[in-house]
Amino acid sequence: MPSFTPSALLRRALCTVLGLGTCLGVQLAQAQSVSEYGMKAILFYRLSQFVYWPADNKPPTPLTLCIVGKNPFGNALGQIEQSTATFETRPPPGDLSNCQFLFIPRSEAENLGTWLTRAESRRLVTVSDIPGFAQLGGMIELPLEGERVGIVINRSSARKSGFEFNAQLLRLARVIDR
């Protein structure tokens, strides 16, 4: 699994906080490591700041970001300052009643259709690193693209539930409309 140096991680996190900037293009390094999932944990957390919610579905504060099934982030989530959101792991079948964001890990790929249906019925923002997630109807995919973590956004899926994304995020992401 690729790794990130703490300075690269800090630089990327700072860029994300300041409007994402060029942080998604920072090269991975070989020194002291932070895992691929450490970077994805930060993105999962920061994405909540770039989603516009429908008027009839305003989220509570703090947000609850849920991970279903096996948590791929390990202890990376515990290292993130959680002032605007909390993380919860939900074992399948998973109670999603208090969730606003739903991360569906690769370990749940065979149940993807079920999770997407449940998330749509609850109007949750869906995020995953399952290959092809956005093409399959998920809202935000976090693929590993060489040595970078990318972002793929399916605007059609998001709009179906009334969500829209900040223009800064859309400029940095690969956007599909299906």
Task: For every predicted segment, state its role.
Residues 2-18, 24-178:
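Short hydrophobic alpha-helices and adjacent helix-cap/hinge residues
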